[in-house]
Amino acid sequence: MTSNSCLISLGLLLVLIQILAPAKAAEHSVFTHKNASSVLGQLVTSSTLVWESYDPKDATQLQFAVEGGKYVTEDEHYPMYVCRVPIDGIQVSGHTEKILQRHVCLAAHYKHGKYDNFDVLMNKGHLGKVGWRHWRKFDAGVPVGAIRIGDDSYIGRHRAPSQPNKDGVVTHWGADFNLGHLEPVGLGKIRVIEAEREKYYDDGEVLVETEPFRYELRDIKLDRLRTDIQENMTELVTRKLENLEDKYSTVETILSYTFNYNQYWGSHEGVARGLPTKIFEKDEAVPAEINWALKHTEKRSENKAVHTKLWPGTAINVTLRGNYVTLEAPYSGKLFAFYYGSDESVSRKISAEVRKSYLKEVKLEFSPVYWIENGTLVPTTTTTTTTSTSTTTHATTTSTNEPTPINEPPLVHMKDNGVQHSGPDTLEKTLHDSPSSNELNSHEAPENMSSDPGKDVALAGFGVNAAGSTFIAGSALLTLLLTIFLSL
């Protein structure tokens, strides 16, 4: 009976796991045209766009989809999104259309079918500008940044024709644009489905993506509750100070060493990997320059001048040890994207993790004084007693070879020589200013997103899955159920 109860409980647990586990839509790469000077062109994988399989259960999925136009009816106006479906083994572009509470893809194909299973073009990072660019057959080839669809064509559209009604007023019901594709054969043409028939046009619009050429990261704040700092004392350099003269004198040397300064600022969905990025940290006059999502290492060097006074024929060993620190922490910040041909930037709040390794401080250590000749330690002054036949006690001083025994260890001095790079990192300083939690609303739109409804360009934003809260609640419930099951 007990075994049956366990089996039933296990079955229920597996069913709940299937129900509560968030399903992630499949994603596929997007290719764009990047070389307008060649006939064939060069295809490059987009760092900000993806094709994502449509999930009718995800009510928030389409908030980051690329718009292809508007659908107008007497009852409602709603955006159409760029989609694709495989027909006879070839990907065909189209636009979405609402049927009740779900969407279908209306393919730009002579079969003119409506498909339930399709991919939607998603601007996941929205730090790449996506917009429709006017095209005509006398233009020089395929526009740079055009988004490829199928074997050798690019996503295009043409405005749907409007007809005056009986009162002479021009109105339009349905899709304001017919989506299709640009065929670059010869001078090129845009093919769409219009009135359920294929039509070709010498002009229209082509969907293009403009990626940023650099980033800037500002307003950085660490989450101090989750900051981890590890320290490790490392030997940097060891040197011998020796007096080869015949008198008590000062000896000095320069100690040189190198160390690595590493920094990695994490990655983020939709942000181009490897793009030049300037990091503006608090109290840093000059921003650090890295490549986004790549580890950046600098080889740094420092010099320390060390001196002391020694007796003839003696020496000491001096060692510099460094406190090497590794800091890891979640952080929030504002990422700015910059584009060629535009003075405006697009900014977005992001959250990621930073990891830094740096030399925080340098300490001096030195050995006891020893003889250069045989390496034995030079003794210090001591007092002993000897007893004579008259039992008189005399204080005497014992000594070894010259020089006279030293009374105390020498003072060793160290000072900086040249530019110094070690010291507490600026991120450590921000820990005193950071709140205990820096969570941001990932759904916020970019602060400088265009509010002009007539400007058909998709800008800034980071794709998120609103099912995250459901997943957290589901995880808690699964933990509870698992605990109950194990107790049976």
Swiss-Prot record:
Coiled coil: none annotated. It comes from the Eukaryota. Residues 22-465 are extracellular. Keywords: Developmental protein, Differentiation, Glycoprotein, Membrane, Neurogenesis, Signal, Transmembrane, Transmembrane helix. One of its GO terms (biological process) is axonal fasciculation. Residues 380-453 are annotated as: Disordered. GO terms for cellular component: cytoplasm; plasma membrane. It is found in: Membrane. Residues 487-488 are cytoplasmic. Glycans are attached at N35, N232, N317, N374, N448. Residues 1-21 form the signal peptide. It is a single-pass type I membrane protein. Residues 380-400 have a biased composition (Low complexity). The keyword DNA repair does not apply. The chain crosses the membrane at residues 466-486. Required for normal axon patterning during neurogenesis. This is Protein unzipped. The lineage of its organism: Eukaryota, Metazoa, Ecdysozoa, Arthropoda, Hexapoda.
